[in-house]
Amino acid sequence: MSSSPPLDGSDHPAHSSGQSPEAGNPTSLARSVSASVCPVKPDNPDSTEPEAVTALEASDGFQINSKQTDRLPLQGHSPCAAAAAPSSAMPLRHSSEAAGVADSLEASAERRTQGLRFHLHTRQEVNLSITTTRMHEPQMFAGEEGWHPENQNPSQVNDLQQHQEPENARHEAGPRDAPSDTGDLELPGERQQKHEVADREATMRGGRLQQDAGLPDPGKGALPSGHCGRPDSETLMEVDAAEQSLVAVLSSSVGNGSASGLTLGNPLMEVELPTCSPSSEILNGSIPIQDLQPPEGSVEMPGTDRAYGGRASSSSVCGSSQPPAESAEESCSSITTALKELHELLVISSKPASEAAYEEVTCQSEGTAWGQTRVNPSERWTESERRTQDEDRPQVSHAIPECVKTEKLTDASPDTRIEDGENATFQGPGGGLSTDHGAPRSRGSVHESRSVTVTSAETSNQSHRTLGVEISPRLLTGEGDALSQTCEQTKSLLVKDLGQGTQNPAPDRPATREDVCRDAARPSLEVEAPPSHSSGPCILPPLGFPAADIDRILRAGFTLQEALGALHRVGGNADLALLVLLAKNIVVPT
């Protein structure tokens, strides 16, 4: 009982000084601090900052109380209480222990406050950048477990329990379990705060991930706020499962983002890509079908480029299209074919008039009417008759007298009209002989009237002149070959005409009149028929062409020989003859 006054004296001045009664009772102080820090309202996620402020105020108040408690043993030691020194040593020891406990509680409160501020800062970053928060989630949870005082300083809590047990046993037996209750209040409070914060963060991030990636909400399996009384192992396992689900969601989202080249916040783009892919495949499948269709306008050369241009533009819109190389080759081949055909026509038209006459005029075409020519069918000789005649007279050169009378009518105009009247009488070599077949020798007369227009500048004082030209054709015989009749080339057609022209020269007479007259006579006289198997002599086509047509061709810059040859080829059509002559000047590229 002697030890109670010093205890009362040491306690009552503390009450009189205005200090809280909790300064002498560390158990009640620990309960107040843990009660101020532990409860966290799950419904209001923004209430963490006021709780952190409350924890700071509680830690400051406890620090002040601990300092005053350190001064209490000094105030309690008086000269009258020297006998109570052994009993006062116990409060001094308890005060030092309470100071250590206060320091540990202050450090833990500061760490919890820093953790709460870190959660607030992290929550703001989550609101600003969802993707960054999701990437750093596992690291953040690992950091929380690393700096938490429960994991770092487990010895401090044990020291607190060991130091508080003697004092509680001394005062009363009822609060003997107070240190264990303090530890039970403190440790579940910290775990409750940690798990509630983790649950809220997991729920928020799980909902956002479900909205972004369309995955099931990982927060459904998390621990709700009302189940703080569950065992620690189950709580940690649930938190770890939530973290693993978040990590799996993040890894799948990052993999999908790197594969598709899109951000995590654009899931609609990832959905639209496979939606558009079938249509693109259909387009790619329809392009070769369009390319297989023949291009329109490939026949017409002016419209070819337009058709190819339209085809190229449509294929570029569709996407990957083949270049129009095949169509270009087809167009080139069609153009080349057309040019070859034109070249063949030009080659045929560029042949000399005599060669054209050889091809067209044969012995089989004697019955065809050429202008005003009339041929008697009885004048045809058979090949057997001619062979018989040649065998009877092998060494006799047969000469057929042919009288050609040429009458030239000169008008007053520069264009002179010359009318040639030729009376040719052909008589067979053996007129009075009879052959084995008994066919009589026939005589025929071919009357040809030809009208030829010659461009000249003769005056009106020139008179009509008549030229007599004797032509002696030769019959060429061959051994074992078919006999053929040819007309000998005229040696000098206008010898007499030139002699008369020099006696009476005209002042405006052109110097090329001789050539013009010679060219006019050559197409009808200078004809050599090739060997043929036909029967009978070759009848030359007449030159009964209008003077206007010949004049038109001559004015185009062509010679009379070319004009007559072209008219012979086309059958007297002046337009077609002029077109043939003009086509000769076209150069075909090779």
From Swiss-Prot:
Q: Mainly localized where? A: membrane
- One term under GO cellular component: nucleus
Which intervals of the chain are annotated as region Disordered?
1-116, 144-234, 277-331, 359-466
Compositional bias (Low complexity) at which positions? 78-91, 313-331
Tell me yes or no: is Signal among this UniProt entry's keywords. no
The organs and tissues expressing this protein are described as: Highly expressed in renal outer medulla, renal inner medulla, duodenum, ileum and jejunum. Moderately expressed in renal outer cortex, renal papilla, brain and liver.
Compositionally biased intervals (Basic and acidic residues)? 162-179, 188-203, 380-395, 404-420
Q: Where in the cell is it found?
A: Cell membrane; Nucleus; Golgi apparatus, trans-Golgi network
The organism's superkingdom is given as: Eukaryota
Q: Which UniProt keywords apply?
A: Cell membrane, Golgi apparatus, Membrane, Nucleus, Transcription, Transcription regulation
Domain called UBA: residue spans: 544-584
| UniProt keyword Membrane, yes or no | yes
Which portions of the chain have biased composition (kind: Polar residues)?
Answer: 16-35, 150-161, 362-376, 451-465
Q: How does it assemble?
A: Interacts with YRDC.
Q: What does this protein do?
A: Mediates transcriptional and post-transcriptional regulation of SLC5A1. Inhibits a dynamin and PKC-dependent exocytotic pathway of SLC5A1. Also involved in transcriptional regulation of SLC22A2. Exhibits glucose-dependent, short-term inhibition of SLC5A1 and SLC22A2 by inhibiting the release of vesicles from the trans-Golgi network.
> How is this protein named in the record?
Regulatory solute carrier protein family 1 member 1
**Organism, as annotated:** Oryctolagus cuniculus
